Amino acid sequence: MQRRHFIARAGIAAATAALGLAAMPAQAQADKFPQRPIRLVIGYTAGGSTDIPFRVLADNASKILGQPVIVENKPGAGGVLPAQMMQSTAPDGYTLAQVAMPVYRLPYTTKINWDPVKDLNYIINLAGYSFGLVVPADSPIKTMQEYIAYAKANPGKLTYGSPGSMTTLHLTMEELAMKQGVQFSHIPYKGNSESMQALLGGHVMSVADTPAWAPYVEQGKLRLLSTWGEKRSARFPSVPTLKELGIGIVQTSPFGLVAPKGTDPKIVQKLHDAFKKAMDMPNYRESLAKFDMEPYYMNSQQYAQFAAETVKKEKAIIEKLGLAKAQ
């Protein structure tokens, strides 16, 4: 009998110890994180305006965290593949993903079994792109106000090019049309090189794009009507923003970092703090400036709120345009 009691007590003690040990590793992992290299997956090709600043950021973060942060390129599908990866990635903080704006459109354009708001753990927003609207230098349209006036006087006749249908540039131009009560005619191109040549060749009246237009503006071949950031471009300080013109649009297609759902909050906080320090270093700002970009910081809570609000806004625009796909 005594032996049975001893065995029972020993079994209870072992079970209790096992429970304690099960809880301890998670706590210890969070406290000692990171203990091995971190993968940072981005949705665009190597050598571009997204990739190059990310590599500077990763190098900065490596020095802060004491472990290598390795950038991995996973291009395709409009930049959404890294976020998709997070749905099957262990929530241990060792694989992170860049989130691009097209991720927020997925519920309305593609059949998916996950939620971009609920099924990603938002860490930090890092930066945004520079966008603007250009016309040929010899266009009779000389200001943004004249651009809108022309569209009102000529419904559906004012054409604009973008890098493609359902891109941020396309949807922002349609948001602009909705806000101003006008109708544009959209011409999608395969990229900014193609759209620039179409504009310079007189095949389209205007183009909304990233600063592929910048050298042509500086050469006097194109006229920049507006930029879309929170404040004026340092490179083109005489050009107004849509916001200051009273149009009420700020669009920089912000992007940042996420971890898989279920990642320990302590690990998320460590990652946030490290990448915040990394993005505050001068070399990161300099790497962005080469592409007319600037840091755009949001903490974890702000970034998650931004994601929730953006998903709702994208839904309204996509449904208004009749572009939503049946799920």
UniProtKB/Swiss-Prot annotation:
Signal peptide residue numbers: 1-30
Record-linked CDD domains: PBP2_Bug_TTT (cd07012)
A GO cellular component annotation in the UniProt record: periplasmic space
Record Gene3D superfamilies: Bordetella uptake gene, domain 1, Periplasmic binding protein-like II
Key words of the record: Periplasm, Signal
Family annotation (SUPFAM superfamilies): Periplasmic binding protein-like II (SSF53850)
A Pfam family hit: TctC
Keyword Secreted in record: no
Localization per record: Periplasm
Post-translational modification: Predicted to be exported by the Tat system. The position of the signal peptide cleavage has not been experimentally proven.
Family of this protein: Belongs to the UPF0065 (bug) family.
Entry protein name: UPF0065 protein in gbd 5'region
Species for this entry: Cupriavidus necator
